[in-house]
Amino acid sequence: MRRTRSTRRALLVAVCLSPLIALAAWQAYPFRSNNFDTVSVSRGSIESSVSALGTLQPRRYVDVGAQASGQIRKLHVEAGDDVTEGQLLVEIDPSTQQAKVDAGRYSIEMLKAQLAEQRAQYTLARQQYQRQQRLAAGGATRTEDVQSAQAQMLATQARIEMYQAQIRQAQASLRSDEAELGYTRIYAPMSGTVVAVDAREGQTLNAQQQTPLILRIAKLSPMTVWAQVSEADIGRVKPGMPAYFTTLSGEGRRWTGKVRQILPVPPKPLDQSNQGGGSPTSGSGGQSGSGRVVLYTVLVDVDNGDHQLMAEMTAQVFFVAATAENILTAPVAAIHDDGKGGQVAWVVGSNGKPQSRQIRTGISDRLRVQVLAGLEEGDRLLMAAPDGSDS
């Protein structure tokens, strides 16, 4: 009987102490809830940047075309060859141009012979006129004969001037024909690498309406990235801003450079661009209709001394607006607006309960933000505001 009473008394004491034990345990352990995740404030580095896709192109290149019509007799280079300024690249059959030059020279020779004949005629006409003047002084000739001799002398003098003008005209035509003959031998306008060949030996070129393109020469260093930046981010990109990029084949290597230029107008689609115009990014300026995306072209120059970068490579570009190292950082998702133009974070206090703190932040990337004031290293933050809070 005594054992039964003792047992009941122990159970009664346990029931009375259970709430006190639960309260003490709740206060002793940190705040936990299945509805919230916590993260810690830690030190790290943040880079505020704008990302974009781009295409690599040689900064300096020239398209070599033909100014003379005819069949390509010899092509002296292939794609990938290094050339020097003045090197012979292409020979075009010069038969037609050579015939024009020969005809021009023969025409000049004929005109010179005619000029010599007229000079002889002028000498004779002048002598006859002088003779008539002497006869007229003695009254031995008529006035009409003197006038006729004078007219003959002046006419031959005029023909001399006419032939001289014709010779000058023929010489000008000959220079034009000789220049066209020179166009049948095409030389490198600059030193560089042949990056494309668009013609073949035996191909006939017609340069009457437009210049046929034969090949392209480019300097492979420096290269230029033609990056496409959305209109939402273009305001953050400035000339002279540092930038870096990676390529698919670069195995994580970073190439660095600076923004050289921001083109003020988005590139036109290919169907709106003039032939031979546009840019390497033409056609990517956006879509028509309400879903149109406007992209602006930003040019970044980069050294390519080791020739690891090639034309038309795709580049993932990052324009660096600001950087900070060894700073307090917190996840962007853990920072909330307080509704008054400020920012707050919910910190798990020493008693395990969430506390609201006013904070001040600096630069941020897409994941973390710099903490300037209000938090300390190691603080535990709630990723979401607790139930019942104003934030």
Swiss-Prot record:
Which top-level group of life is the source organism from? Bacteria
Sorted keywords for this record are: Coiled coil, Periplasm, Signal, Transport
**Protein induction:** Expression is iron-regulated and under the tight control of the PVD-specific PvdS sigma factor.
The family database entries (InterPro entries) matched by this protein are listed as: CusB_D23 (IPR032317), MacA_alpha-hairpin_sf (IPR030190), RND_pump_MFP (IPR006143)
Task: Give positions of region: Disordered.
Answer: 263-289
User: Which stretches does UniProt call biased (Gly residues)?
Assistant: 275-289
Q: Name one GO biological process term.
A: pyoverdine biosynthetic process
Among Pfam families, the record links this protein to: HlyD_D23
Q: Name one GO cellular component term.
A: extrinsic component of membrane
The entry's localization annotation reads: Periplasm
What GO MF annotations does this protein's record show? efflux transmembrane transporter activity
Q: Which residues form the signal peptide?
A: 1-24
Where are the annotated coiled coils located? 108-180
Question: Without the gene, what phenotype results?
Answer: Mutant shows reduction of extracellular PVD levels and accumulates PVD in the periplasm. Mutant lacking pvdRT-opmQ secretes PVD and can import ferri-PVD, but has an approximately 20-fold increase in the amount of PVD present in the periplasm. The pvdRT-opmQ deletion mutant also accumulates newly synthesized PVD in the periplasm. Mutant accumulates unwanted PVD-metal complexes.
Subunit and interaction comment? Part of the tripartite efflux system PvdRT-OpmQ, which is composed of an inner membrane component with both ATPase and permease domains, PvdT, a periplasmic membrane fusion protein, PvdR, and an outer membrane component, OpmQ.
Q: What family is this protein classified in?
A: Belongs to the membrane fusion protein (MFP) (TC 8.A.1) family.
Task: Print the miscellaneous field.
Answer: Was originally thought to be involved only in PVD recycling. It was later shown to be involved in the secretion of both newly synthesized PVD and recycled PVD.
Q: What does this protein do?
A: Part of the tripartite efflux system PvdRT-OpmQ required for the secretion into the extracellular milieu of the siderophore pyoverdine (PVD), which is involved in iron acquisition. This subunit is an adapter protein that stimulates the ATPase activity of PvdT and connects the inner and outer membrane components. The system is responsible for export of newly synthesized PVD after the final steps of biosynthesis have taken place in the periplasm.
Q: What is this protein called?
A: Pyoverdine export membrane fusion protein PvdR
Name its species.
Pseudomonas aeruginosa (strain ATCC 15692 / DSM 22644 / CIP 104116 / JCM 14847 / LMG 12228 / 1C / PRS 101 / PAO1)
What is the primary gene name for this protein? pvdR
